[in-house]
Design a protein with these regions (language model features):
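Basic, low-complexity intrinsically disordered segments
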Residues: 1-155
């Protein structure tokens, strides 16, 4: 360490901590906004699809048309594949309040993994465990793949 910095070390350390805390708050806010945006996109797609059986053909074309327009302006996050994920996200988590309480330390990769869990009770259990135990998305994915929920259920 440069001896000229020694008297400034406490203020340097404090400011570094402030920056790190601010970056963490910004990341969490952006993550929450992104997840809720994806959920709301899924909700809007579902609402549009459910607006009548006579519109079945219209509904089949909806996602490809949306994707073509949205990817032009906003990039590949709005591909047909991702729009299907957002739609499924809304179906799997129909109550946005569940998301509001859990998105602090879960990112989109966590939720994408959760979409693979067909059983609602298991999905909520995995979501809570991932949030409470700070599982990475990779750990969550592995635990889903090994049906960790079933082994915990027997304990």
């Amino acid at each position: 360490m440069d001896s000229n910095l020694i008297p400034y070390q406490p203020v340097i350390s404090d400011i570094k901590n402030l920056i790190a805390a601010g970056q963490n708050v910004a990341y969490n806010a952006a993550n929450r906004a992104m997840i809720m945006t994806y959920w709301n996109i899924g909700k809007r797609i579902v609402e549009e699809e459910q607006s009548g059986a006579e519109r079945a053909e219209y509904g089949k074309r909806l996602i490809p048309v949306l994707s073509a327009e949205l990817t032009k302006e906003f990039g590949n996050s709005y591909s047909s594949r991702n729009l299907h994920y957002y739609r499924k996200f809304c179906h799997c988590f129909p109550d946005s309040e569940i998301l509001n309480t859990r998105v602090q330390n879960l990112n989109w990769s966590h939720f994408r993994a959760l979409l693979r869990v067909p059983d609602e009770d298991a999905r909520i259990w995995y979501m809570n465990e991932a949030a409470n135990e700070n599982w990475s998305a990779r750990t969550l994915d592995r635990n889903i793949g090994t049906q960790y929920y079933r082994s915990e259920e027997r304990r």
